[in-house]
């Protein structure tokens, strides 16, 4: 064995704390960023929040022309020590992105959220407490409510409920009587044993003089399977109902709720604050950051001036350290805003047809297209478009919504999957309800428009729109 010295040159990327902070801020959603900045304000005395009225607007050029890419790139850049295109896997695990939401709203930007977090069981127990039950019946009612799932159906038999009462002796008739009272709670039909039971309970709440009530009850009691399969021809034959009567009875049944429990929202509220505002001004689409969504930070000059006059080294070091942290945070925030604005402007420039005419005119676009246009890495584009929302006259969308794969067209062009999905939705909306379009027919109609896709692809797009197959869409006209 021989020993020796060898000289080797190598380069490595050093992930400094400042770089980690810059990339992490880039990934955070607006709400997460607000929490991050609020914590920084509480922990760092060298940071303070500025008055929005005194803050200089740095979101867009004075000529209000956001689609000028050259102007968009003329922003204050970060020092070379903050290469935001560094590998995200080394630092942070991305959260789950959200989808597009909502319809058009006015210039005011409210926070969007779910209506309630009350569970179905809580809502039913509230009604139990308001009902004059005996102690025994209240115990039975509690057991019944505990056995109701999120869709509103009873998950156990009445015998199991009776046995769950323990030392309390109750008859099956008592359990049945309490169950019938609960089934008339709001929402009506809750705690039903099955779909047939649920629909019949809801029908029982109608006035006896309601037109087509008996016909609807007949269909539910004896021919629910035919109705589920949309086999109207057989249904007319076995019920001996005329087509007009059958249509009215089916309409009455369709007005009922097959999952009454889902009308009570149980999920946590979802908050959406738009990061970017898109408006049309003087015939051009303008893009700006939502100035109300992010706190404006600045250095506290009073404390900063104490840096050189501190009484001891410990105080001086404390002030210097916090001052440096504050400067890096402000610069990282500026970099985040600049990157978000540049990417958003580029997206709007590429997708102007969508904002003008809708989903059918969405252009195929991938991360690499925007990355090349703004001269950034694809990983940076992915971070800055995740959990960032754009508010436009067409609604609120996550920035990632504007990226979609492409499908070749007959003329040698390309169509985005989003546009094709919109066309499928449009074709189905215009179909004859008595003869709905099959996936094969939809494929043929798309082919006539020069869009060559497989039938299974059309089926996938239809399912992503939560549209049932043609045999389930068939209706009486």
UniProtKB/Swiss-Prot annotation:
<keyword id="KW-0804">Transcription</keyword>
<dbReference type="Pfam" id="PF00309">
    <property type="entry name" value="Sigma54_AID"/>
</dbReference>
<dbReference type="GO" id="GO:0001216">
    <property type="term" value="F:DNA-binding transcription activator activity"/>
</dbReference>
<dbReference type="InterPro" id="IPR007046">
    <property type="entry name" value="RNA_pol_sigma_54_core-bd"/>
</dbReference>
<dbReference type="GO" id="GO:0016779">
    <property type="term" value="F:nucleotidyltransferase activity"/>
</dbReference>
<keyword id="KW-0548">Nucleotidyltransferase</keyword>
<dbReference type="Pfam" id="PF04552">
    <property type="entry name" value="Sigma54_DBD"/>
</dbReference>
<protein>
    <recommendedName>
        <fullName>RNA polymerase sigma-54 factor</fullName>
    </recommendedName>
</protein>
<keyword id="KW-0056">Arginine metabolism</keyword>
<dbReference type="GO" id="GO:0032993">
    <property type="term" value="C:protein-DNA complex"/>
</dbReference>
<dbReference type="InterPro" id="IPR007634">
    <property type="entry name" value="RNA_pol_sigma_54_DNA-bd"/>
</dbReference>
<keyword id="KW-0238">DNA-binding</keyword>
<keyword id="KW-0731">Sigma factor</keyword>
<dbReference type="GO" id="GO:0006525">
    <property type="term" value="P:arginine metabolic process"/>
</dbReference>
<feature type="DNA-binding region" description="H-T-H motif">
    <location>
        <begin position="366"/>
        <end position="385"/>
    </location>
</feature>
<feature type="short sequence motif" description="RPON box">
    <location>
        <begin position="454"/>
        <end position="462"/>
    </location>
</feature>
<dbReference type="GO" id="GO:0016987">
    <property type="term" value="F:sigma factor activity"/>
</dbReference>
<keyword id="KW-0808">Transferase</keyword>
<dbReference type="GO" id="GO:0006352">
    <property type="term" value="P:DNA-templated transcription initiation"/>
</dbReference>
<dbReference type="InterPro" id="IPR038709">
    <property type="entry name" value="RpoN_core-bd_sf"/>
</dbReference>
<comment type="similarity">
    <text>Belongs to the sigma-54 factor family.</text>
</comment>
<dbReference type="GO" id="GO:0000976">
    <property type="term" value="F:transcription cis-regulatory region binding"/>
</dbReference>
<dbReference type="InterPro" id="IPR000394">
    <property type="entry name" value="RNA_pol_sigma_54"/>
</dbReference>
<comment type="function">
    <text>Sigma factors are initiation factors that promote the attachment of RNA polymerase to specific initiation sites and are then released. This sigma factor is responsible for the expression of enzymes involved in arginine catabolism. The open complex (sigma-54 and core RNA polymerase) serves as the receptor for the receipt of the melting signal from the remotely bound activator protein GlnG(NtrC).</text>
</comment>
<dbReference type="GO" id="GO:0006355">
    <property type="term" value="P:regulation of DNA-templated transcription"/>
</dbReference>
<dbReference type="Pfam" id="PF04963">
    <property type="entry name" value="Sigma54_CBD"/>
</dbReference>
<keyword id="KW-0805">Transcription regulation</keyword>
<dbReference type="GO" id="GO:0000428">
    <property type="term" value="C:DNA-directed RNA polymerase complex"/>
</dbReference>
<keyword id="KW-0240">DNA-directed RNA polymerase</keyword>
């Amino acid at each position: 064995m021989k020993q020796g010295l060898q000289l080797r040159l190598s380069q490595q990327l050093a992930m400094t704390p400042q770089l980690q902070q810059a990339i992490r801020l880039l990934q955070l959603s607006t709400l997460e960023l607000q929490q991050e900045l609020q914590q920084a304000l509480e922990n760092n005395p060298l940071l303070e929040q500025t008055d929005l009225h005194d803050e200089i607007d740095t979101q867009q050029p004075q000529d209000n022309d956001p689609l000028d890419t050259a102007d968009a790139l003329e922003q204050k850049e970060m020092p070379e020590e903050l290469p935001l295109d560094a590998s995200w896997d080394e630092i942070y695990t991305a959260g789950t992105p959200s989808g597009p939401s909502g319809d058009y709203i006015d210039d005011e930007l409210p926070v969007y959220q779910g209506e309630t977090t009350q569970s179905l069981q809580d809502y039913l127990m509230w009604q139990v407490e308001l009902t004059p039950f005996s102690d025994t019946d209240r115990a039975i009612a509690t057991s019944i409510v505990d056995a109701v799932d999120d869709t509103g159906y009873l998950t156990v038999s009445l015998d199991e409920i009776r046995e769950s009462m323990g030392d309390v002796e109750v008859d099956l008739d008592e359990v049945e009587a309490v169950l019938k009272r609960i089934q008339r709670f709001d929402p009506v039909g809750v705690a039903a044993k099955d779909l047939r039971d649920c629909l019949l309970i809801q029908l029982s709440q109608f006035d006896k003089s309601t037109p087509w009530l008996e016909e609807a009850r007949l269909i539910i009691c004896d021919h629910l399977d035919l109705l589920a399969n949309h086999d109207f021809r057989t249904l007319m034959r076995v019920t001996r109902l005329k087509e007009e009567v059958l249509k009215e009875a089916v309409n009455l049944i369709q007005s009922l709720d097959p999952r009454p429990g889902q009308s009570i929202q149980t999920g946590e509220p979802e908050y959406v604050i738009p990061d970017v505002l898109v408006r049309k001004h003087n015939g051009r689409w303008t893009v700006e950051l939502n100035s109300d969504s992010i706190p404006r930070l600045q250095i506290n000059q009073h404390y900063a001036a104490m840096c050189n006059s501190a009484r001891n080294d410990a105080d001086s070091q404390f002030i210097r350290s916090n001052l440096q942290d504050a400067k890096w945070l402000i610069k990282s925030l500026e970099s985040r805003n600049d990157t978000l604005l540049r990417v958003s402007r580029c997206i709007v420039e590429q997708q102007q047809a969508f904002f003008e005419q809708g989903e059918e005119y969405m252009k195929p676009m991938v991360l690499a297209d925007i990355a090349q246009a703004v001269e950034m890495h694809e990983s940076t584009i992915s971070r800055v478009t995740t959990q960032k929302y754009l508010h436009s006259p067409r609604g609120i969308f996550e920035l990632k919504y504007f990226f979609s794969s492409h499908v070749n067209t007959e003329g040698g062009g390309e169509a985005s999957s989003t546009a094709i999905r919109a066309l499928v939705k449009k074709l189905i909306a215009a179909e004859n309800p008595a003869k709905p379009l099959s996936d094969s027919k939809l494929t043929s109609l798309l082919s006539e428009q020069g869009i060559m896709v497989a039938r299974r692809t059309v089926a996938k797009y239809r399912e992503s729109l939560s549209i049932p197959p043609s045999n389930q869409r068939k209706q009486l006209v």
